[in-house]
């Protein structure tokens, strides 16, 4: 299997395994779906954190119907987005634990651990979040709640920073080695037929131009190189200081040397043999 390290810009996103015979068209669809799915989970978790702290969005006719299991605890939302009737501590922990598990499943740290992310993992994380919300809110959330809208794919991200991060599949491009992978080609047309190939692929929105090339050395390698040069510089400084004071160990610099010679005790050793 060919391993693709997916990035957007210089930021690592996830690892993805595929085959050299896969059409680029299918590859674009798969990678874009995973990328957007990860963004969706991040948005849901962000809203769920607010839900766990401050309950539903503002006071409306749904407040009496959508009551969290086990009752609520009033916790005022300082920014005024939610009504402040938060779930109790046990239900709050259900939401928080599920959020942690879902985010860990699709975390960017998976790439550091050499674990690939699949569309099934994205769906699993989404289902976990949906299940946790159903446990805490068995009557469901209001139709206008951002979390429910995300689950139903009715979210409105127009004019938001989150909306700028999303890449619609028709506008999605994949780049490798400064070249756009054309949808009519196969991956093997670019990387050859070696199934053990590992490459860095960058996802980009159409019209934004070619993404920047990868640096010759990674940030970690650059950090280690700078540390090496720093240590070497400190060693050279120490050697210079040692050379400056090395004459103090010379015989001619010993102020008592002449006195010992006159007394005839210059070569006497005091340590037992």
UniProtKB/Swiss-Prot annotation:
Please indicate if the UniProt record lists DNA-binding as a keyword: no
* Pfam families the record matches: CFAP298
Q: Which UniProt keywords apply?
A: Cell projection, Cilium, Cytoplasm, Cytoskeleton
S-S bonds: none
- Explain the consequences of disrupting this gene: Morpholino knockdown of the protein results in loss of cilia-driven fluid flow along the anterior-posterior axis. Multiciliated cells show loss of coordinated cilium polarity with many cilia pointing towards the anterior instead of the posterior. The planar cell polarity (PCP) component prickle2 is uniformly distributed around the cell margin, instead of being asymmetrically localized to the posterior of the cell.
One GO cellular component term, please give it.
Answer: cytoskeleton
Q: What InterPro entries is this protein classified in? A: CFAP298
Q: Where in the cell is it found?
A: Cytoplasm; Cytoplasm, Cytoskeleton, Cilium basal body
GO BP of this protein: regulation of cilium movement
What this protein is reported to do is described as: Plays a role in motile cilium function, possibly by acting on outer dynein arm assembly. Seems to be important for initiation rather than maintenance of cilium motility. Required for correct positioning of the cilium at the apical cell surface, suggesting an additional role in the planar cell polarity (PCP) pathway. May suppress canonical Wnt signaling activity.
**Family assignment from sequence similarity:** Belongs to the CFAP298 family.
PANTHER family assigned to the protein according to its UniProt record, in alphabetical order: CILIA- AND FLAGELLA-ASSOCIATED PROTEIN 298, PROTEIN C21ORF59
Specify the protein name.
Cilia- and flagella-associated protein 298-B
